[in-house]
């Protein structure tokens, strides 16, 4: 687990303290946090007491706590930790996830103010990300997460896609991905940056320009009849 004491960009409209969880059930070729793929020895973990104590120290300076990864949903104990943070401090909590563990999301949702889901591509290409699940199971899990998030009104919902051209190569694929995005979500297209990418292929790959991404977002809004589709510009 890692820690960024103060973040102005990770939790929209909040000054947040950010904790990273190591370990991930995917191996996205474009990932810039590949150092978090594997779980480190337990002696390197941040303790629950440290996290609670650190948040308490920062309450005068922050108005949010964010948990990212790696993949947060691999840690069932995060549910009780987030519950304690919410009940003890009354502060807003956000998590990032890939949405492949809907049962975890169902349990943690009551304590969240914000959830961000990374939808990578269409389910048939999740094998390219090192996902061991068959396409049908990926579909089922992403749809279950979508339905959970559509039914609740407790947390703001963000979906986002890193626009790696090999995995999102057409409007058709992008619009198919919309089937797995809740109606109440804001959806961001994020520019793929080859620097520090995990795979050699991704390091050498071209990126979409910001102009191309803006056109894609505009076309996706037109085709899907959704208006909350944007390009994230601070990357």
Where are these regions (language model features)?
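Short, charged low-complexity linear segments at domain edges
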Residues: 1-14
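Canonical Radical SAM [4Fe-4S] cluster-binding loop centered on the CxxxCxxC motif
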Residues: 11-46
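Conserved beta-strand termini and adjacent loop/short-helix elements that scaffold enzyme active sites
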Residues: 3, 190-192, 231-235
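A C-terminal junction/extension of Radical SAM enzymes
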Residues: 213-235
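Conserved AdoMet/S-adenosylmethionine-binding subsite of the radical SAM
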Residues: 52-64, 73-204, 210
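Glycine-rich, highly charged phosphate/nucleotide-binding loops
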Residues: 44-54
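Conserved strand-to-loop "acid loop" that flanks and positions the catalytic carboxylate
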Residues: 70
């Amino acid at each position: 687990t890692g820690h960024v004491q103060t973040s102005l960009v990770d939790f929209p409209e909040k000054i947040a303290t950010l904790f990273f969880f190591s370990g991930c059930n995917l191996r996205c070729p474009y990932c810039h946090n590949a150092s978090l793929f594997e779980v480190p020895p337990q002696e390197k973990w941040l303790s629950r007491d440290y996290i609670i104590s650190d948040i308490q120290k920062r309450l005068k300076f922050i108005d949010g706590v964010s948990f990212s990864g790696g993949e947060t949903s691999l840690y069932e104990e995060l549910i009780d930790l987030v519950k304690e943070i919410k009940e003890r401090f009354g502060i807003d909590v956000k998590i990032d996830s890939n949405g492949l563990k809907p049962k975890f999301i169902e349990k943690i949702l009551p304590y969240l103010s914000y959830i961000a889901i990374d939808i990578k591509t269409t389910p048939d290409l999740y094998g390219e990300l090192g996902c061991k699940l068959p396409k049908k199971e990926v579909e089922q899990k992403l749809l279950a997460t979508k339905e959970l998030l559509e039914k609740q009104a407790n947390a703001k919902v963000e979906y986002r896609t890193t626009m790696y051209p090999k995995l999102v190569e057409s409007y058709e694929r992008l619009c198919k991905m919309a089937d797995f995005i809740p109606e109440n979500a804001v959806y961001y297209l994020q520019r793929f940056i080859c620097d520090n990418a995990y795979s050699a292929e991704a390091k050498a790959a071209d990126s979409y320009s910001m102009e191309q991404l803006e056109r894609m977002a505009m076309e996706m809004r037109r085709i899907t009849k959704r208006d909350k589709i944007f390009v994230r510009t601070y990357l």
